[in-house]
Regions:
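The feature captures the beta-strand-to-loop junction immediately N-terminal to the Walker
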Residues: 33-35
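Helix-to-loop junction immediately C-terminal to a conserved catalytic motif
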Residues: 48
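ABC-family P-loop ATPase nucleotide-binding domains
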Residues: 78-135
Length: 276
């Protein structure tokens, strides 16, 4: 489990994260959402140990990530938004780096590359940005780590590749892995995540499972604008609306509408989820 308690971090005199408290459980995929500059990437780099918490604490199964202990580093993989090409074939690169992660399986890398319709013998410095991203995603999934942190993994992927990404994550990750994915491409995650975290500047606006969200909020696709809507957006033929779920009705989560509803009604949404 990843436990984050009262986490704070600043760049110079500019605070980015303040009093962030989260518990991320094994076996779940978390979508990390927020506007530009709210600290999503900073949070990922803190969790993987690239940065040190200035206040508060982070614990990954009892280990401080910044301690950089081998038993932690061998169980975490961080995929940044921008990845570097190397003058090597994908398969040679994977074979050379894989041993740093004890659960790495070259067969999984090759299988994931095949699922992405990628040639593993292709030189990485000759790949497009999307091809390079798919190679790194394949490697991340092949490492078999307890923690997988991804920053905008679908950036640069075409539409078929985004579907392949969702399938690959579900196919190749361990059942007990904690997966944290930061993205602005919310529709890319809609069918695969278990929980959603929405960060505001220096605050957590929402941290809830999909089941809890749809039990407390109703996503209405209709032609009549509702008076109790927390957020409404006109679509061809009607509206997508987010309303308090006072009747226990089932509805299909719309992450983009949820994000806007939370940002437009921060205190009200907090009250709904805190049963106030």
């Amino acid at each position: 489990m990843i436990k984050i308690e009262n986490l704070g971090f600043s760049y110079g005199k500019t605070p980015v994260l303040k009093n962030i408290t989260l518990n991320l459980e094994p076996g779940k995929i978390y979508g990390l959402l927020g506007e530009n500059g709210v600290g999503k990437t900073t949070l990922l780099t803190l969790v993987c140990g690239l940065k040190k918490a200035q206040t508060g604490s982070i614990s990954c199964d009892g280990i401080d990530p910044y301690s950089r202990k081998p038993e932690f580093l061998s169980q975490v993989f961080y995929l940044p938004d921008e990845v570097a090409p190397v003058p090597s074939t994908a398969i040679a690169w994977a074979k050379s780096l894989g041993p740093f992660w004890p659960n790495f399986k070259i067969e999984t890398f090759s299988s994931a590359m095949k699922d992405f319709e990628m040639d593993e013998t292709m030189k990485m410095h000759k790949m497009s940005a999307g091809q390079l991203k798919k190679t790194y995603i394949s490697f991340a999934l092949a490492c078999g780590t307890s923690y997988i942190l991804m920053d905008e993994p679908t950036n640069g992927l075409d539409i078929p590749s985004k579907a392949q990404f969702r399938s690959a994550v579900l196919k190749y990750t361990r059942d007990d892995s904690t997966i944290l994915i930061s993205t602005h491409q919310v529709k890319d995650l809609e069918s695969m995540i278990d929980s959603i975290i929405i960060l505001d500047r220096k605050d957590v606006l929402l941290n809830a499972s999909v089941e809890e969200i749809t039990s407390k909020l109703f996503f209405d696709y209709g032609s009549i604008l509702r008076q109790d809507a927390l957020y409404a957006e006109q679509l061809p033929g009607g509206f997508i609306q987010v309303c308090p779920n006072t009747t226990g009705e089932d509805s299909k989560l719309n992450i983009e509408a949820l994000f806007n509803a939370v940002h437009n009604n921060k205190e009200l949404v907090k009250a709904i989820f805190n049963n106030e």
